[in-house]
Amino acid sequence: MEARAQSGNGSQPLLQTPRDGGRPRGEPDPRDALTQQVHVLSLDQIRAIRNTNEYTEGPTVVPRPGLKPAPRPSTQHKHERLHGLPEHRQPPRLQHSQVHSSARAPLSRSISTVSSGSRSSTRTSTSSSSSEQRLLGSSFSSGPVADGIIRVQPKSELKPGELKPLSKEDLGLHAYRCEDCGKCKCKECTYPRPLPSDWICDKQCLCSAQNVIDYGTCVCCVKGLFYHCSNDDEDNCADNPCSCSQSHCCTRWSAMGVMSLFLPCLWCYLPAKGCLKLCQGCYDRVNRPGCRCKNSNTVCCKVPTVPRRNFEKPT
């Protein structure tokens, strides 16, 4: 009866009994010290534990032909995890205490989880730092790769003709002058300057004054008809339908007279052609730098001597 009265409360004998098979009551339990160490973890360590991903592989370096390939960090993590599994398991004392008290089981699981997470984060940071050192060491050790790095902004190369002064041969091309007007009589200067023209529509159509007149006065239709009706490949009547010096002059003019009844714009071709000749002459007179005299004498001018520059410093 007295023994039953003393053990009336079921939880009191469990608290008064010695822990872990005979440890005195005043002696500190190492598991309590471990729980205190867990609560000391800082917020940065917890974030590092949550942000680590052990299933990703870091950047690897392409192995050189003379060097052995370095082991992959992913296999190293796998071996560490395989060898570290027995370490993360709960000790036999915790498993023995779970049989007797159910209240200490969640605490031991949390302790083992946090400790395993901290160890895995430490291994991940160590392996990442070692892989970075391998990458940096291989990049700095490679001589040709380091020498091939461009460190200066490339400058545009100057053409030799831009800085080269005019030689005597270039000055001799314009040495022959006209006796009347004094202008140069070389082929480049006396060549007539045509009206400007340009290719449009992705360089498929030539835009010039002659083509504008041909399409505006419907002469392009006449040229197409003469081109398909002519049997001689060397016949150029399609290019100059109004020419009087080529063959089949009467036939061409008669055909154009009949077509002008259906295409009245053909009557504007000859006046437009005259305006084109006038514009061509004015443009050539303004832009041609050479001589335009027909019968004149040619005078040879001396090449001017260019004095040498003295680059010495004044005394």
Curated annotation (Swiss-Prot):
Region Disordered, annotated ranges: 1-140
Keyword Membrane set for record: yes
GO cellular component: cytosol; microtubule; ruffle membrane
Alphabetized PROSITE patterns for the sequence: SPR
Locations listed in the record: Cytoplasm, Cytoskeleton; Cell projection, Ruffle membrane
Stretch list, region Required for interaction with CAV1: 118-315
Residues under site feature: Cleavage: P144, V145
Bias (Low complexity): 108-140
InterPro entries cross-referenced by the UniProt entry: Sprouty, Sprouty_domain
Cell membrane recorded as keyword: yes
Family annotation (PANTHER family): PROTEIN SPROUTY HOMOLOG 2, SPROUTY
Primary role: Antagonist of fibroblast growth factor (FGF) pathways via inhibition of FGF-mediated phosphorylation of ERK1/2. Thereby acts as an antagonist of FGF-induced retinal lens fiber differentiation, may inhibit limb bud outgrowth and may negatively modulate respiratory organogenesis. Inhibits TGFB-induced epithelial-to-mesenchymal transition in retinal lens epithelial cells. Inhibits CBL/C-CBL-mediated EGFR ubiquitination.
Annotated domain remarks: The Cys-rich domain is responsible for the localization of the protein to the membrane ruffles.
Family: Belongs to the sprouty family.
Self-association state and partner proteins as the record states: Forms heterodimers with SPRY1. Forms a tripartite complex containing GAB1, METTL13 and SPRY2. Within the complex interacts with METTL13. Interacts with RAF1. Interacts (via C-terminus) with TESK1 (via C-terminus); the interaction disrupts SPRY2 interaction with GRB2, potentially via disruption of SPRY2 serine dephosphorylation. Interacts with PPP2R1A/PP2A-A and PPP2CA/PP2A-C; the interaction with PPP2CA/PP2A-C is inhibited by interaction with TESK1, possibly by vesicular sequestration of SPRY2.
Name used for this protein in its record: Protein sprouty homolog 2
